[in-house]
């Protein structure tokens, strides 16, 4: 989904085709129920078809010995909810009938596994054993999902072992989405994420053992040091729910991706693995070999690890441990342009004395300045020392171009430990701890390693689950979780780097040829620290042919945002070689925050109630309501400033001081937010033929705004000010070198001091400042509506086909728009843009944050599956879609 154009929703029809095919070890199909649990349901009848009430059903987890007992009701039904996913034996006993036992029941993640029994009149004490492959379709649930178990995950080709890779095999997936920077708030700036059903990538939820792992700053998947989401070897099963009308599934409308980690069992088990790819296995680039000054950069991937699990006490206490390590050397080839030694001497002879020290220090940072001579406009001489010809002169003695072969080193390691405890038949618990540490080579400079930047990205998380059986009809599952992570980007010794070169110097245009010096120092320090607490609780109550569920998903989130440090290192530009020679800056931009980092608090409280009603043995109706409260993001330091309303609602009188139109000392990002966001959902599943199921549903979903919204709104003046000096700036100053008379950087410092004084004293005529405006009044929460109608048919015992129509509509989606622009063509041209001056000269760029964008999607999704034998299954997905944004 893309943002609308100015004043008009940018709408363009388009058609999409998507075909995906995969062959993997057979996983049981899942229908979404809970995030970390499963269930076994069924009905007991006799040979005449009459139901058998009061039959005793005993289930046993074959791996861990967990046992639970239930009785069939007056209609012969039984329901055992909130089970740990795994392999179970189910035994049924009733007076006058021979016992029956099925040892091949696989209760998958989020699945209600249906197991029906037909009892025979007892003629001996022998137990009847029943078995058979799990059906390819589940007739009791209207949701759409794809499930992969551990053997499937291990054997599925997966570059990098990324946890999110299996998403692309779900119906309706759109791979490798990307968008413009304006899409970032809307979540369509892809980052390798997957989109479903025309909804943005931030509408995907990644849940591991009940712990939401989305990056809270972007709401996208959370790859750390290697930009991979590691931990695949610790996963027992993943379920991708793309049409989930069960309100206990969560808030995410596009997909809810649930993972559960492996557990120890009564038998010791484990594995070891090593994946390696090095330079010796990779061909060199032809053009690198053709150039004597370059060589093939070093490349290496070393991905290894192992796991071990087993019993501590038989049938009682179990452990599992997994360790994963990744070492990566990424090859990098860069082409750089550097000043020649002769040109350096020429510049030093012409510069004013007070700028020579800065330039001498700058030239020393270039190091190797050899290379192929490059012709540059205004260069006065050639590489052989002769004067350049032409008017203006156009010599090749000022700049040398060469290639640089180097590599960046990243490493990451993940340790996962889990304990499972069967306290007694009515109480079970598990605990999982994970530590993910590593260092990312955030930027590798081709000129001087002094400007290299790194990011240490540790993450520590804890999750637990506790199941209590009050009775066979009332079971509660409590699932708290916690995570903390840090992701800060800067050179290893930032102060040393700035002492060596305190600015970033950029040439702009073909006549300013030299490669940027200073790396990405103008973007450092940036990043975040994030602390999150989660409280999930799900109460399941079976009453007759109803199963009621009540629960909560609560997230408490503390974001320490370090992005306010961006721009504090000045960026100085020049546009011609003459400007470089004379030390003249075209622009100099510098940001002045009162603090380089600020905390923000978020609370997301969701409550839900749901009824799954078996109207008949063949027809199931699910109806539920989810209520969401998203707090108004709070800065406890009251360092938020914003306009008194949307930009077009304020007075644009230039004689009105800025402190009369910009509100300061605020804690909340918005004036007000909704107290409740109601999300009703309903669906049916109707098995109108023995091998055919019709599914239909409608639901409303509301996603969270990403934490990056704090970057936008909390970067407003007077707490964060940005000014531009230089020839093209408004603050004045011309010298490239800082700290000298008439310095462009010094002019920005003076402009900031002038603005701070003038703002606090209510003066007018201040230097124009950039600002982000928010909507007037209460923020409209973004939400989605989703509906579907589908048929699924099983062919024999080895194949199935599915066709479904999916429609979505997104409403009140966030977008950004520049609203203080102007045009210089003519009076009345390009209306409503004003001529020759902005609508409000007190401001520079004004970014309006709004939530008025929308989209519509219609798609036909076809899926065919075939069991191939030897544990293999093939699947083909085809999607035809039409999206109107």
What are these regions (language model features)?
Residues 2-3, 9, 18-149:
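Periplasm-facing N-terminal accessory domains of Gram-negative outer-membrane beta-barrel systems
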Residues 130, 196, 259, 306-310, ...:
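Residues on the lipid-exposed face of transmembrane beta-strands in outer-membrane beta-barrel proteins
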Residues 163, 497-500, 508-514, 635-679, ...:
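Solvent-exposed loop/turn elements at secondary-structure boundaries
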Residues 192, 253-255, 302-306, 413-417, ...:
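Hydrophobic, lipid-facing positions within transmembrane beta-strands of outer-membrane proteins
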Residues 201, 262-264, 313-315, 424-426, ...:
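Outer-membrane beta-barrel channels and translocator barrels
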Residues 268-272, 319-321, 429-431, 476-480, ...:
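Transmembrane beta-strands of outer-membrane beta-barrel proteins
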């Amino acid at each position: 989904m893309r943002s609308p154009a100015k004043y008009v929703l940018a709408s363009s029809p388009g058609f999409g085709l998507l075909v995906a095919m995969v062959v993997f070890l057979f996983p049981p199909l899942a229908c979404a129920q809970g995030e970390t649990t499963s269930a076994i349901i069924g009905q007991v009848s006799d040979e005449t078809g009459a139901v058998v009430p009061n039959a005793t059903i005993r289930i046993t987890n074959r791996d861990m010995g967990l046992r639970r007992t239930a009785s069939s009701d007056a209609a012969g039904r039984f329901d055992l909810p909130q089970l740990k996913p795994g392999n179970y034996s189910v035994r049924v006993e009733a007076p006058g009938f021979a016992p029956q036992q099925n040892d091949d029941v696989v209760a998958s993640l989020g699945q209600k596994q249906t197991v029906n029994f037909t009892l025979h009149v007892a003629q001996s004490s022998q137990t009847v054993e029943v078995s058979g492959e799990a059906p390819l379709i589940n007739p009791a649930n209207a949701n759409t999902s794809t499930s992969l178990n551990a053997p499937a995950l291990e054997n599925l080709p997966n570059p990098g072992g990324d946890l999110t890779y299996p998403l692309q095999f779900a119906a309706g997936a759109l791979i490798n989405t990307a968008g413009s920077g304006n899409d970032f708030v809307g979540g369509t700036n892809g980052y390798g994420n997957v989109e479903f059903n025309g909804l943005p990538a931030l509408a995907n939820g990644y849940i591991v053992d009940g712990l939401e792992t989305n990056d809270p700053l972007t709401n996208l998947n959370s790859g750390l040091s290697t930009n991979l989401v590691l931990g695949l070897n610790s996963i027992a099963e993943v379920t991708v729910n793309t049409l989930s009308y069960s309100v206990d599934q969560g808030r995410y409308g596009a997909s809810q991706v649930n993972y559960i980690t492996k557990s120890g069992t009564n038998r010791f088990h484990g594995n070891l693995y090593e994946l390696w790819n090095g330079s010796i296995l990779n061909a060199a680039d032809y053009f690198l070999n053709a150039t004597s000054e370059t060589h093939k950069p070093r490349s290496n991937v070393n991905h290894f690890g192992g796991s071990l699990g087993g019993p501590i006490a038989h049938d009682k206490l179990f452990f599992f441990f997994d360790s994963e390590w990744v070492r990566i050397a990424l090859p990098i080839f860069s082409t750089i342009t550097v000043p020649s030694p002769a040109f350096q001497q020429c510049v030093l002879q012409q510069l004013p004395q007070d700028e020579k020290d800065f330039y001498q220090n700058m030239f020393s940072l270039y190091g190797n300045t050899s290379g192929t001579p490059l012709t540059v406009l205004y260069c006065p001489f050639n590489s052989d020392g002769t004067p350049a010809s032409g008017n203006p002169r156009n010599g090749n003695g000022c700049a040398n171009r060469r290639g640089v072969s180097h590599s960046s080193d990243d490493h990451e390691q993940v340790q996962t430990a889990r304990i499972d405890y069967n306290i007694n038949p009515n109480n079970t618990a598990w605990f999982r701890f994970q530590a993910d540490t590593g260092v990312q080579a955030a930027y590798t400079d081709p000129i001087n390693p002094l400007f290299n930047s790194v990011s240490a990205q540790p993450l520590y998380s804890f999750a637990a689950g506790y199941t209590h059986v009050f009775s066979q009809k009332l079971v509660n599952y409590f699932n708290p979780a916690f995570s903390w992570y840090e992701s800060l980007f800067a050179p290893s010794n930032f102060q040393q780097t700035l002492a060596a070169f305190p600015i970033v110097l950029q040439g702009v245009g073909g006549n300013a040829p030299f490669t940027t010096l200073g790396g990405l120092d103008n973007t450092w320090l940036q990043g975040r620290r994030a602390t999150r607490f989660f409280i999930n609780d799900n109460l399941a109550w079976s009453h007759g042919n109803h199963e009621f569920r009540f629960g909560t998903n609560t997230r408490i989130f503390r974001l320490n945002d370090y992005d306010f440090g961006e721009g504090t290192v000045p960026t100085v530009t020049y546009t011609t070689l003459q400007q470089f020679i004379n030390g003249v800056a075209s622009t100099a931009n510098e940001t002045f925050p009162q603090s380089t980092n600020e905390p923000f608090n978020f609370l997301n409280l969701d409550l839900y109630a749901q009824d799954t009603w078996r109207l008949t043995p063949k027809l199931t109706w699910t109806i539920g309501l989810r209520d969401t409260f998203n707090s108004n993001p709070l800065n406890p330091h009251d360092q938020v400033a914003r306009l008194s309303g949307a930009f077009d609602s304020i007075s644009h009188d230039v004689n009105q001081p800025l402190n009369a139109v910009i509100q300061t000392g605020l804690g909340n990002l918005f004036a007000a937010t909704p107290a409740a966001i109601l999300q009703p959902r309903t669906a049916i599943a109707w098995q109108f033929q023995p091998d055919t199921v019709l599914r239909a549903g409608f639901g409303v979903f509301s996603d969270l705004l990403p934490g990056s919204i704090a970057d936008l709104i909390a970067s407003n003046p007077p707490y964060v000010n940005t000014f531009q000096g230089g020839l093209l700036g408004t603050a004045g100053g011309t010298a490239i070198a800082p700290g000298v008379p008439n310095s462009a950087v010094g002019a920005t410092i003076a402009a900031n001091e002038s603005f701070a004084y003038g703002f606090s004293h209510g003066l007018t005529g201040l230097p124009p400042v950039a600002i982000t405006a928010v909507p007037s009044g209460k923020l409209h929460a973004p939400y989605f509506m989703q509906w579907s109608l589908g048929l699924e048919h099983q062919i024999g015992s080895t194949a199935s086909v599915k066709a479904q129509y999916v429609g979505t509509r997104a409403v009140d989606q966030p977008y950004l728009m520049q609203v203080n622009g102007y045009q210089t063509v003519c009076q009345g041209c390009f209306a409503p843009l004003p001529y020759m001056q902005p609508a409000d000269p007190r401001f520079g760029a004004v970014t309006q944050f709004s939530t008025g964008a929308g989209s519509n999607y219609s798609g036909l999704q076809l899926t065919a599956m075939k069991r191939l034998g030897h544990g293999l299954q093939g699947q083909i997905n085809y999607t035809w879609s039409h999206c109107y944004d």
